[in-house]
Amino acid sequence: MAHEHGHHKMELPDYKQWKIEGTPLETIQKKLAAKGLRDPWGRNEAWRYMGGFTKSVSFFDVFFKGFKWGFAAFVVAVGAEYYLKSLNKDKKHH
């Protein structure tokens, strides 16, 4: 019996897509080369300087991350409260 549970072989990205050219890692490689050294793992860190990882995060981004959806939920909750209170005003209490 095979114990396959619908798992597929994980596909790893091609290592050649990560380039250090145009990143701060290139400067580090040049400084190391001037001393006769080389960082063979430099390319493994190149992903940090490409794509969505390069956007710097500001205090504003962190503090107001969910503000838009939170404010919308607040408005809906306040609207529901006022609506439910208006229904209660129609009922006479002794």
From Swiss-Prot:
GO annotation terms (biological process): electron transport chain; mitochondrial respiratory chain complex I assembly
The organism's place on the tree of life at top rank: Eukaryota
Keywords (A to Z) from UniProt: Acetylation, Electron transport, Membrane, Methylation, Mitochondrion, Mitochondrion inner membrane, Respiratory chain, Transmembrane, Transmembrane helix, Transport
Membrane topology qualifier: Single-pass membrane protein
Pfam families in UniProt: NDUF_B12
Record PTM N6-succinyllysine, positions in chain: 19, 30
Modification Pros-methylhistidine occurs at: 3, 5
InterPro entries referenced in this protein's UniProt entry, alphabetically: NDUFB3
Location, primary (coarse class): mitochondrion
Coiled-coil regions, chain positions: none
Description of post-translational modifications: Methylation at His residues by METTL9 enhances complex I-mediated mitochondrial respiration.
Modified residues (N6-acetyllysine): 19, 30
Location(s), subcellular: Mitochondrion inner membrane
Transmembrane segment boundaries: 62-84
Cellular component GO terms held in the UniProt record: mitochondrial inner membrane; respiratory chain complex I
Family the UniProt entry places it in: Belongs to the complex I NDUFB3 subunit family.
Described purpose of this protein according to its UniProt entry: Accessory subunit of the mitochondrial membrane respiratory chain NADH dehydrogenase (Complex I), that is believed not to be involved in catalysis. Complex I functions in the transfer of electrons from NADH to the respiratory chain. The immediate electron acceptor for the enzyme is believed to be ubiquinone.
Subunit structure as annotated in this protein's UniProt entry: Complex I is composed of 45 different subunits.
Protein name stated in the entry: NADH dehydrogenase [ubiquinone] 1 beta subcomplex subunit 3
